[in-house]
Amino acid sequence: MTEESKDRARHLLKEFGLYEYRDAHPSALSGGQKQRLAIACAIFSGRGILILDEPTSGLDGRNMRLIAERLKSEARNGRTILVITHDRELIESCCDNVVEVGTKPSEVQ
């Protein structure tokens, strides 16, 4: 791993409140910590498109807002992010377009 990659990883771990666990085995992390780590890994991947299924389920309000802010930032920087969620607060916090899936056809809002 390059120094630049290590710096990016450190930054993401710090941003998501996980730096103190950098040497911990994932099984030692709580569910919310694992969830934040998975999102940090997805962001770190550098992929142009991220597909996130219920990315904030089980997270407290503070961490949900942290994730929402980072997703907005990633989108502003040109990343396409598809979020599948039932969380209205997350939708209102970071989504530009919404498609509701139900029994009737929906339109993009």
Predicted regions and their residues:
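Conserved ABC ATPase "signature" region
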Residues: 4-21
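Short loop immediately C-terminal to the Walker-B catalytic DE motif
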Residues: 56-57
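Conserved ABC ATPase signature
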Residues: 25-29
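ABC-family nucleotide-binding domains
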Residues: 60
